[in-house]
Amino acid sequence: MPIPRTIIEQIKRIIPPLDGSLHKGQSGRVGVLGGALDYTGAPFFAAFSALRFGVDLSHVICAPTAAGAIKSYSPDLIVHPILNESSSVDKVKSELQSLLSRLHVLVVGPGLGREPYMQSYARLAISLVRERGMYLVLDADALFLVGHDLSIIKGYRRAVLTPNVVEFKRLSEQVGVDPDAPPDERAGVVSRMLGGVTVLQKGAKDIISVDTTGEEADLSASHIEGADAEKEKIKETIAVDVEGGLKRCGGQGDVLSGCVGTFMAWGKCYESGVYGDGTVPTSRVPLLAAVAGSMVTRTTSRRAYAKSGRSLITQDLLSEAGPAFEECFGGDKGRL
């Protein structure tokens, strides 16, 4: 099923121009919170793929036990080893506040793990993001955190959740979705019950849904100003069945998180008037970012699989990110 033309046109509007008018940082600054002793690849893939998809700066906020490995993977990443188990909450909070002031979006979850201290820091970061009205992507063990306390994310319409099959089943049960509900409608139900967050349900085809008709959807708590509350009550589902690769390997979901984060960072730059015509509403950005991220990541996977076949690993996707972006959106009117 083709993506509606209006969606594609809106996505292209939030992509920064490559015309020499912007300085460093105005094409997106992404942060990834995750990375502990056992998990160093996931935050790298999320943060580095954001660079490959076109952001200017990419930061990793991690535990000290992960920092050395992540730094060694690429000199292009800015690594902050502040999630120290022995640090005081006040110290970490102060450091997070300083870092968040420099970012357009925070991706929480890749390599986060389930250690209590990492989960606690993720909860803290999410609360600070909400206070600042930043865009937010939640994946992997950040979804585990949400499942244990739905209030962490409920009503925050600047967020995108990216569950895989297992994570979506668990999340559906936790919010109370009827197990007999049609499969293609469940993501919309989860969105409504979580107050209008955008849900990107990964699968053979990706289902992106947003439903802001429930009572929990909150424009003011989402820092969406000047919008008509009635017009903002929407139900929308987009199925993305762009061809992807046939090999599944650990890390591809992290690439998706980085790509969605890229488009959300651009959405923030667009919202702030750094470039663009201002015709795309702020409330559209999470849906557009999820659709665009799905399209580009699936295309990246297809291109990498065509070269590597059964031997494909996630690193193979990174060199295909730029060409995949061009294939999906590239070239016209001075844009990426």
Curated annotation (Swiss-Prot):
Catalyzes the dehydration of the S-form of NAD(P)HX at the expense of ATP, which is converted to ADP. Together with NAD(P)HX epimerase, which catalyzes the epimerization of the S- and R-forms, the enzyme allows the repair of both epimers of NAD(P)HX, a damaged form of NAD(P)H that is a result of enzymatic or heat-dependent hydration. One of its GO terms (biological process) is metabolite repair. Keywords: ATP-binding, Cytoplasm, Lyase, NAD, NADP, Nucleotide-binding, Phosphoprotein. SUPFAM superfamilies: Ribokinase-like. Its EC number is 4.2.1.93. It catalyses: (6S)-NADHX + ATP = ADP + phosphate + NADH + H(+); (6S)-NADPHX + ATP = ADP + phosphate + NADPH + H(+). This is ATP-dependent (S)-NAD(P)H-hydrate dehydratase. GO terms for molecular function: ATP binding; ATP-dependent NAD(P)H-hydrate dehydratase activity. The lineage of its organism: Eukaryota, Fungi, Dikarya, Basidiomycota, Agaricomycotina. Its main location: cytoplasm. It comes from the Eukaryota. InterPro entries: Carbohydrate_kinase_pred_CS (IPR017953), CARKD (IPR000631), Ribokinase-like (IPR029056). Belongs to the NnrD/CARKD family. Its cofactor is Mg(2+). ATP binds at residues 202-206, 244-253.
